[in-house]
Structure formats: C-alpha cells, structure tokens
C-alpha cells in the first residue's frame, strides 16, 4: 500500500520551501473557466443553444478520464462540426468562457468546476473515399476510426490504438506511438497521415489549413498557442494487409497494457509531466522513490511513475499537491524542473 499524505498539509509545507515556486507556477496554466459568470450572460447563451442538448450545473468529471472536477455552469453537446463552431460563436458573443471537451484525457478540472460553457464534441461523421482519403469530424473517437479503417483495409492509423482521444485531440497533441515490434525505435506521429483540416480560427473564421499551418511538433501544434478549434480532418491512408494491421493492434495494446495502468480500473489523465530529452520524467520521479506515494486518493502509479491515478475519491487539490510534491522532490534531488503536460481547466480555488 502506498504512503498516504494529507493534501492541505503538503500544500502548507510546500509554501515554505523551494518547491513552492514550482507549485505556484503550475497554477498559471489555468486560464479558462476560472471566474464566475453573470447569470444574465449564462441565460443569454442558454437561450441561443438547442435546449434538448443543454444541461445546467452539469457534472463533467464523468466525461474526463481522471473522473475529477466540479460541474460546468453549462454543458452542451455539439453533434456536428458546424454546431461546435456555432456554439463557440454564441459563447464569445456573450463574453462567456468556453472549453471544448473530447474524451477528457490529458486535463485536470478544478474542484470548483468550469465557469462558462463546456462543449462536448460529439461531431463524428466520417466520409471514406476510394483513394485512401477519409474526412473525419473532430469528435470522432480514435478507437472507432481505427477499427473501421482496419476493417476496410486502410493502413496508417492502427499504430495509435489504445490511446484515449478524439480525432480533434489527436491533432491537437500530434498523437504519437513507437513504431511496430520488434524494433520500437522510431516515434510515429499522426502528422504522418494528416493531409488537411478545417478549423474555426480564433477570430471566428472557418477555413481549411495544411500541415504547415498546424505546425506539428512533439506534443505540440498551433492549437496549443491559439484558440483555433479543429472541426474536421482529412487523413491520407494507404492500402494495408488486414492480418498485419490486426497484429500491430494486438501488439500495441499488449505493450501499453504492460506499462500503463488501465483506465477502467485506475482513472488517470495520462502522462503528467512533459518529456525531458534524454531523461524520462517518470524515471526521475521513480528514482525519488515516489511510486505508490499518495495524497488523499491521488496516487503516483506503481506501474508508471509519470502517471497519477484516482483511487476513487481524489480531488483536484489532491492531484495538484501530488504534482507539486513530485516537482519539489525531483528538483531537490536532480535539479530538474518538471513541467506539467496536462491542462488545468476551471476553478481551483474552491474550498
């Protein structure tokens, strides 16, 4: 059993040492849904959305892979790419903050919830073309798209099986995985099968853009630095051998299963800290002896030290304190600053 520590006690301790600098910097990543919204503005947004797909004071933790966080003032299901863009238009016209939610991986929602409009991206239309192109709305679940592509004999997406993401999230993060067994030496990126995408630019314009605009990097694209939103994506796939693709699916699932906690049993946000070139962030946390260390119901995984899991009733405060503890320990022992990879969404000031 992992060591258990009270979250508030750790936060007080960190405020008195060098780790407080790291902990304080972490909160600057929180820029959306942090401040209460006037009820009249929320009413104005709600009145312009499809009522049947709108919920007020809606829990959003169940729609995240961490299963953590308070409610959203407004939760809206967008069924098409155009519907998604229009919902953003409405929120911005009323000066209400908004956030697009896919499968809810790679984020931590504050215990105070999200002040504004959370849009669940349910846009999932897929158009297949005989030349290997497929045009996919951004809310399509990657697992579903991979399954259908393999069944149809189209290769290029099977490498990314087992990573929880929508298509929009895959482009946002430049989804990646190691090349197939036996070598597993090269990192393969979703950018390799990307042809174009249609976006809503942060100025409201709808336009098609290419890879040069997206600026694919390691865990990085233009979407990290703007409020552009992906509406649909065109992938360029190639004919493949179904048997070979199925083998890759199974091998990749087995490889991940042996190295990552399963979300069904241990909710998590995926990797917590960004990659440090030449030195794995998880390796540094592990070398500090922190596997199994817990604060409240948030625990550093026994399987992978760069993953934190929700043991059942973890709060965002628990996770923040655990992140700060790991940052302080690694900085104290190795002089390395761990930078969170996950996004902080909503109000973290709730008591």
Give a label for each model feature.
Residues 1-9, 16-18:
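Compositionally biased, low-complexity flexible segments
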Residues 28-32, 55-56, 62-64, 107, ...:
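Phosphate/pyrophosphate- and phosphate-bearing ligand-binding catalytic cores of soluble enzymes
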Residues 38-173, 177:
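Anion-binding (especially nucleotide phosphate/pyrophosphate-binding) glycine-rich loop
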Residues 126-127, 195-199:
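Short polybasic amphipathic segments
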Residues 161, 195-196, 341-344:
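Beta-strand segments within the central parallel beta-sheet cores of soluble alpha/beta enzyme folds
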Residues 173-197, 208-220:
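Active-site glycine-rich loop that binds ribose-phosphate moieties when present
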């Amino acid at each position: 059993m992992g060591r258990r520590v009270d979250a508030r006690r750790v936060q007080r301790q960190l405020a008195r040492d060098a780790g407080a600098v790291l902990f304080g910097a972490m909160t600057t990543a929180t820029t959306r849904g942090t401040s209460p919204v006037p009820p009249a503005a929320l009413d104005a947004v709600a009145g312009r959305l499809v009522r049947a797909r709108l919920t007020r004071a809606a829990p959003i933790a169940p729609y995240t892979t961490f299963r953590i966080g308070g409610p959203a003032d407004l939760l809206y299901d967008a069924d098409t790419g155009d519907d998604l863009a229009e919902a953003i238009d409405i929120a911005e016209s009323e000066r209400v903050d908004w956030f697009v939610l896919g499968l809810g991986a790679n984020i931590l929602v504050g215990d105070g919830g999200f002040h504004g409009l959370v849009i669940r991206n349910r846009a999932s239309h897929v158009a297949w073309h005989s030349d290997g192109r497929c045009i996919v709305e951004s809310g399509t679940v990657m697992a579903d798209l991979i399954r259908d592509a393999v069944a149809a004999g189209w290769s290029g997406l099977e490498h990314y099986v087992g990573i929880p993401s929508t298509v929009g999230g895959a482009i946002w993060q430049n989804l990646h995985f190691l090349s197939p067994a036996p070598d597993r030496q090269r990192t393969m990126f979703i950018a390799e099968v990307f042809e174009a995408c249609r976006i809503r630019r942060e100025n409201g314009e709808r336009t098609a853009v290419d890879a040069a605009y997206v600026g694919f990097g390691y865990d990085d694209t233009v979407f990290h630095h703007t409020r552009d939103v992906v509406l649909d994506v065109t992938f360029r796939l190639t004919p493949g051998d179904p048997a070979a693709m199925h083998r890759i699916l199974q091998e990749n699932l087995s490889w991940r299963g042996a190295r990552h906690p399963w979300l069904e049993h241990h909710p998590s946000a995926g990797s917590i800290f960004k990659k440090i070139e030449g030195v794995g962030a998880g390796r540094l946390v592990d070398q500090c002896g922190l596997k199994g260390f817990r604060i409240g119901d948030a625990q550093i995984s026994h399987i992978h030290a760069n993953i934190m899991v929700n043991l059942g009733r973890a709060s965002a405060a628990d996770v923040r304190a655990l992140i700060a503890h790991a940052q302080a320990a690694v900085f104290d022992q190795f002089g390395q600053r761990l930078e969170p990879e996950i996004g902080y969404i909503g109000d973290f000031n709730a008591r």
